[in-house]
């Protein structure tokens, strides 16, 4: 398992379900996909569900 999975990231913008945007993890911006069926708002804390390449798959906490 990737050591980043389970960590907390912060959404840098509003993300509708399955949308791609940015999230900050450990002070670094990452590409992020909302893996949830609900929207994520800018500034919302999210859990990293999985990592594919340089893309975080996040869900709201």
Where are the predicted features?
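Terminal membrane-proximal soluble interaction domains of membrane-associated proteins
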Residues: 2-61
């Amino acid at each position: 398992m990737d050591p980043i999975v389970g960590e907390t990231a912060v959404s840098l913008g509003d993300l509708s379900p399955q949308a791609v945007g940015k999230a900050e993890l450990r002070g670094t911006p990452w590409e992020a996909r909302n893996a949830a069926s609900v929207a994520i708002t800018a500034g919302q804390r999210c859990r990293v569900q999985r990592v594919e390449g340089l893309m975080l798959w996040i869900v709201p906490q």
